[in-house]
C-alpha cells in the first residue's frame, strides 16, 4: 500500500521543519490524493499529496490568491517538496471543524449560513476588468469563448475512444456543448474570483460561534463567473440552503437552475479527465435533471 510510504515522507518533512518527529501522524485519503496530519508539542502541520501531476502547484497559487481576497484564514504553505517520486506541500494546520459536521441546531445553521454567504459575496466582489481568466495574465471578455477554452479539452476527452463515458453520455455532452451559447448568454457579464470547489467540506467553522473559520482546498481558482462556485454549494449539506440565502443578497440571472446542472456536469467531466473518476449512474441522473429543466425552460 502507498499510505505507509506517504506517512514516512510526511514524518521526514515534519522532522526537517520542526527538528523532531511527530507524535501524531494520521493519514486520510481524499478525492485528489492524501492528507497527513502531523503534530508534536513543537507544532502541527498538514502534509498533502496529490494523484494529479501539477495539482499541488495550482493549489499553492490558489491559496495565495484566496488569502489576498478573504479576511478569514486560508492555510499558509510552509514549503513544497518532492521525495521518492512524490510531490507534496506542507501547510498550516488551521483550527476549526469541518462544516460537513455542523450540528442540526437552528442557531448554528443560521450563523454559518449568514457567515459563509457573506464571505462568498466578498470573494465574488473581486472582479477582473479584462474579463474571464484563461491562463496567467491572459483573459477573454466573452464567457462563451472562455468556456470554450476551458472545456474544449474536456469535451475531447469525453468523446475520445479511451474515455469511460458511455455512448449515451457522450451524446448528452455533445448536445450540451452545442447549446452552451444559449445556456451561458444570460451570465456573459462581469467575472468574479472563484474558489472553484467551495462546497462546505472545504470549509472549517468555529465551534463556539459557528461562523466560518477557514477556507481550504481551492481547485482551479481564478476569474470565472460567480455561478462557477454556486453549484458546488449543493454538493455537501444541501440542507444548509446556502444558494437560497446567497440569492436573497444578490439575485441571480434567469435560468440559474439550468446552468447549475450544466456547470456541474462539465465540472464532473473535468474531474474525470483529471483523475479517471467515473460514475455513470451519478452522471446520468444529472443529465436527466438538466434535460427535464431544459425541456420546460
Task: Identify the function of each model-found stretch.
Residues 53-56, 236-239, 277:
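Acidic-and-aromatic substrate-binding clefts and catalytic sites of carbohydrate-active enzymes
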Residues 2-18, 113, 125-196, 206-208, ...:
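An alpha-helical support segment within catalytic cores of ATP-dependent transferases
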Residues 248, 270-297:
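ATP/Mg2+ or Mg2+-diphosphate-binding catalytic cores
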